[in-house]
């Protein structure tokens, strides 16, 4: 009897070992630093799925290890060279034009309004639009309100933007909004912004407080003004090539974990 149990246990461990050895590794690309709250959430997601031993292992590669721009990540996911990422709706609008609506200034009344829109049928409809573009939309992120920062002066009214060269995401609405405020909007990859500010190529940027703190933009910008002009969400996306390589049970487990982000 003991010998029989030993054989069963050995067979079980052998099969589990094979599953582990054959597990697919999915790398999640992120432009933000390792301590950024986005990556803390993505690591939570990865740990949650990894512990289920479904034959898929997730690994977050932060700090632009797979590229310095979210646009490059989106192109990579379409081509299948980037497996998964969390990107902003601003650059996504360059591939799915409807996403640019999230770059409208002062679009959401408050956090409750923001969450209600994205957690309902409207949010689901936008995630579904990614299918035709070679991507699978999994979940939304709250990136927070974006505020103006620069090294010259505080911004308390639109006229204060005059003469300021401000980095924005590559979104037509964002570019037009900052220009309408009197600034000079300059689309640039997020990973290049710190150096551009340090070298004086740009005067400032606009982003959420968490990003400014985590990526240390306060070292190269003196003023952070609470303008709350944009609140574009982030979207967690997987390449359709990667998604289609997964089994139905794996897809279900991943979707369930992503829904809790």
What are these language model-derived features?
Residues 17-23:
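Sec/Tat signal peptide C-region and signal peptidase I cleavage site
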Residues 24-113, 121-124, 128-261:
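N-terminal secretory/targeting leader peptides
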Residues 1, 23-24:
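Absolute protein N-terminus
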Residues 8-17:
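Bacterial N-terminal signal peptides
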Residues 1-9:
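Bacterial N-terminal signal peptides that target proteins for export
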């Amino acid at each position: 009897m003991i010998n029989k149990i030993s054989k069963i246990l050995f067979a079980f461990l052998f099969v589990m070992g094979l599953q582990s050895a054959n597990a697919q590794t999915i790398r999640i690309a992120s432009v933000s630093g390792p301590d950024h709250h986005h990556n803390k959430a993505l690591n939570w997601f990865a740990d949650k799925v990894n512990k289920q031993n479904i034959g898929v292992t997730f690994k977050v590669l932060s700090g632009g290890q797979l590229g310095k721009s979210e646009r490059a990540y989106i192109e990579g996911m379409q081509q299948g060279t980037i497996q998964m990422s969390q990107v902003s709706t601003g650059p996504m609008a360059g591939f799915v034009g409807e996403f640019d609506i999230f770059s409208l200034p002062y679009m959401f009344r408050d956090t409750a309004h923001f969450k209600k829109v994205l957690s309902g049928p409207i949010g689901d409809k936008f995630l579904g639009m990614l299918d035709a573009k070679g991507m699978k939309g999994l979940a939304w992120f709250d990136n927070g309100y974006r505020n103006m920062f620069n090294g010259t002066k505080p911004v308390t009214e639109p006229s204060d933007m005059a003469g300021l060269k401000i980095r924005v995401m590559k979104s037509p609405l964002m570019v037009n909004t900052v220009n309408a405020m009197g600034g000079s909007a300059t689309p640039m990859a997020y990973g290049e912004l710190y150096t551009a500010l340090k070298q004086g190529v740009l005067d400032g940027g606009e982003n959420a407080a968490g990003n400014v703190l985590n990526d240390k933009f306060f070292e190269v910008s003196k003023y952070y003004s609470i303008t709350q002009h944009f609140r574009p969400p982030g979207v967690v996306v997987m390449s359709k090539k990667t998604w289609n390589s997964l089994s139905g049970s794996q897809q279900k487990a991943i979707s369930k974990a992503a829904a809790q982000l």
